Curated annotation (Swiss-Prot):
ATP binds at G46, A47, G48, K49, G50, T51, R164, S173, Y174, Q236. It is found in: Cytoplasm, Cytosol; Mitochondrion intermembrane space. One of its GO terms (molecular function) is adenylate kinase activity. Monomer. It catalyses: AMP + ATP = 2 ADP. Its EC number is 2.7.4.3. This is Adenylate kinase. The gene is ADK1. Keywords: ATP-binding, Cytoplasm, Kinase, Mitochondrion, Nucleotide-binding, Transferase. Residues 163-200 are annotated as: LID. Gene3D superfamilies: P-loop containing nucleotide triphosphate hydrolases. One of its GO terms (biological process) is ADP biosynthetic process.
């Protein structure tokens, strides 16, 4: 009798050991690397780029290249391109397309967060910029895969943007009504203060929208011709917008 009980105990110990080994093997399997992404995010101020870009960064482990923030960062760090750009801006000029494209190239080559791809935000704004960007990416054998446009009526944008709050360091955006931070005027991630931009008022926005539409319609046409453009209704709830973006990206 004791022999049978001993055998049962041995079998149970072996089964437990097998279970431990299987669990250990699973834990050592390398985590799945997300699919890479190379895209442009197009949309007027207030369309939700600052809300959706962090979702894309987290989903694809890619870098968010908001060109305005990138330009400010390069100037602050006094990189060769930043120094050159500052001279132009101090003289009241516009930073050239070549400088902006080279800044993007620099980020792709030196920013470790860009290893799995990038989300470009705020560039290109003209067809010559789009062509220069395509040339640079072709040289690097990293062509754009998607251009996603967040589409939204202007009148809704005015309501949205006048309540917008921004975390300056990261570019994360919130809204007092539609997407409030957990704590009033405080960034959810860092605990740092949020700000409301001085140009986030109705009159300033309407002027920016006129400029945006004039610039962007040709860009949308450019990417439609190349076959990588997709449009998303950005007037929906942010979670629904996110789901539609993933569909555009084949997820």
């Amino acid at each position: 009798m004791s022999t049978i009980e001993d055998l049962k105990a041995t079998v149970e110990r072996l089964a437990a050991r097998v279970h431990e080994l299987e669990a250990s093997a699973k834990s050592k399997i390398a985590p799945e690397v997300p699919k890479s992404i190379r895209m442009v995010l197009i949309g007027p101020p207030g369309a939700g780029k600052g809300t959706q870009a962090p979702n894309l960064v987290e989903k694809y482990c890619a870098c968010h290249l908001a060109t305005g923030d990138m330009l400010r960062s390069q100037v602050q760090q006094q990189t060769p391109l930043g120094v050159e750009a500052k001279k132009i801006m101090d003289a009241g000029g516009l930073v050239s397309d070549d400088i902006m494209v080279n800044m993007i190239r620099s980020e792709l080559e030196n920013n470790s967060k860009c290893k799995n791809g990038f989300i470009l935000d705020g560039f290109p704004r003209t067809i010559p910029q789009a062509e220069k960007l395509d040339e640079m990416l072709a040289e690097k054998k990293q062509p754009l895969e998607k251009a996603v446009e967040l589409k939204i009526p202007d009148d809704l944008l005015v309501a949205r943007i006048t309540g917008r709050l921004v975390h300056p360091a990261s570019g994360r955006s919130y809204h007092k009504v539609f997407n409030p931070p957990k704590k009033e005027m405080i960034d959810d991630i860092t605990g740092e203060a949020l700000v409301q931009r001085s140009d986030d008022n109705a009159d300033a926005l309407k002027k920016r929208l006129v400029s945006f539409h004039k610039q962007t319609e040709p860009i949308v046409g450019y990417y439609q011709k190349t076959g990588i453009w997709k449009g998303v209704d950005a007037a929906q709830d942010p979670k629904k917008v996110w789901g539609d973006i993933l569909k555009c990206l084949g997820q």
